[in-house]
């Protein structure tokens, strides 16, 4: 009897876990899976608009074809760290 109870409880718990995983997967953005993230450090600060600063830095480094979709900028003293998404 104990093993049957244990089996039923295990099945119920597994169904809860699997349904939660399906909910999480349904909430994922399929476009986010196609984005590539690149990081680089550049000289100078982020300025007033770090997103534009990082985009300009990546274009200067690799040309117009190297333009990111969006960026985040962090000041590191005399340098700044850019984390950018590319398609």
From Swiss-Prot:
Superkingdom of source: Eukaryota
Pfam families for the chain: SCRL
Signal peptide: 1-26
GO terms, biological process: defense response to fungus; killing of cells of another organism; signal transduction
InterPro entries: SCRL
Keywords: Antimicrobial, Disulfide bond, Fungicide, Plant defense, Secreted, Signal
Subcellular location: Secreted
Gene Ontology annotations for the cellular component aspect, listed alphabetically: extracellular region
Disulfide bonds: 46-73, 54-82, 71-84
Family that this chain belongs to: Belongs to the DEFL family.
Listed name of the protein: Putative defensin-like protein 235
Lineage: Eukaryota, Viridiplantae, Streptophyta, Embryophyta, Tracheophyta
The gene coding this protein: SCRL26
